Amino acid sequence: LPASVDWRKEGAVLPIRHQGQCG
């Protein structure tokens, strides 16, 4: 995710598995 986007805020609405793929 772009540094301009707070992953903590976006993570609240995005599926956890999405974070797993990116992180």
Curated annotation (Swiss-Prot):
Q: What's the record's pH-dependence note?
A: Optimum pH for casein is 7.6 and philibertain g 1 retains more than 80% of maximum activity between pH 6.7 and pH 8.7, and 50% of maximum activity between pH 6.1 and pH 9.8. Optimum pH for PFLNA is 6.2-7.2 and philibertain g I retains more than 80% of maximum activity between pH 5.8 and pH 7.8, and 50% of maximum activity between pH 5.2 and pH 8.6.
Reported regulation of activity: Strongly inhibited by the cysteine protease inhibitor E64 (L-trans-epoxysuccinyl-leucylamide-(4-guanido)-butane). Not inhibited by the serine protease inhibitor PMSF, the aspartic protease inhibitor pepstatin A, or by the metal ion chelator 1,10-phenanthroline.
Listed under GO biological process in this entry are:
proteolysis
Q: What class of enzyme is it?
A: hydrolase
Which top-rank group of organisms is this from?
Answer: Eukaryota
Alphabetic keyword roster: Disulfide bond, Hydrolase, Protease, Signal, Thiol protease
User: Matching InterPro entries, A to Z?
Assistant: Papain-like_cys_pep_sf (IPR038765), Peptidase_C1A_C (IPR000668)
What SUPFAM superfamilies has UniProt attached to this entry? Cysteine proteinases (SSF54001)
GO-annotated molecular function: cysteine-type peptidase activity
Task: Quote the Pfam families the UniProt record gives.
Answer: Peptidase_C1 (PF00112)
Q: Any idea of its EC number?
A: 3.4.22.-
Describe the subunit structure.
Answer: Monomer.
Q: Per its database record, what is this protein's job? A: Thiol protease.
- Which family would the database say this protein is a member of? Belongs to the peptidase C1 family.
**Name of the molecule in the record:** Philibertain g 1
